[in-house]
């Protein structure tokens, strides 16, 4: 089932929640209800009004792969990519098509072009009009579905830290 940010925002209010961007992003990317995503985050250590640790996020993504039939691939990892960025080279982010079978090789990076010195949610969404992604900035998570940023924040705020592509295996 597909959900939008607006639907998740209403669910968040009805649960009297704040700082639940990871819950909303997971719900939208994996087609889960807010309640299901909230539960999955809670059992991995998320406390009411707080985010989720990277360990919890990794565990959640692995769980979605093994238990729910999704293929989750790392598309961008800033820690890996920083060593390849020198000077004021112009780049742009465009994700390659995500492999959807076990025999396909995982994606660790995409094209070698970003725009300016910062990689933004807006740029990534514009360059990736198809597919589902969970995007992490410094202290925020959001979902992008078919080029549409599902978030309250103005798209483009914050440098990208990690991006995971999500494909449902049928």
Show which residues each predicted segment covers.
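Intrinsically disordered, low-complexity segments enriched in small/polar residues
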Residues: 1-3, 89, 131, 162
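Conserved active-site-adjacent core of cysteine acyl-enzyme catalytic domains
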Residues: 47-139, 145-154
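Noncatalytic regulatory segments and standalone regulatory/sensor domains
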Residues: 148-170
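Active-site nucleophile-adjacent alpha helix/oxyanion-hole segment immediately C-terminal to the catalytic cysteine
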Residues: 1-74
């Amino acid at each position: 089932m597909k959900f939008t940010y607006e639907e998740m925002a209403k669910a968040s209010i009805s649960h009297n929640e704040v700082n639940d961007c990871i819950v909303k992003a997971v719900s939208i990317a994996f087609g889960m209800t807010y309640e299901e995503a909230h539960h999955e985050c809670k059992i991995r250590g998320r406390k009411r009004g707080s985010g989720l640790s990277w360990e919890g996020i990794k565990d959640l993504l692995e769980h979605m792969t093994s238990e729910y039939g999704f293929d989750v691939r790392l598309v961008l990892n800033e820690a890996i990519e920083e060593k390849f960025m020198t000077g004021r080279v112009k780049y742009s982010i465009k994700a390659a098509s995500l492999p959807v079978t076990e025999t396909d090789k995982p994606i660790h990076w995409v094209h070698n072009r970003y725009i300016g010195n910062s990689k933004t949610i807006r740029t990534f969404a514009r360059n990736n009009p198809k597919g589902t992604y969970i995007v992490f900035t410094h202290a925020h998570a959001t979902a992008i579905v078919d080029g549409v940023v599902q978030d309250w924040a103005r798209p483009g705020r914050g440098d990208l830290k990690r991006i995971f592509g999500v494909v449902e295996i049928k």
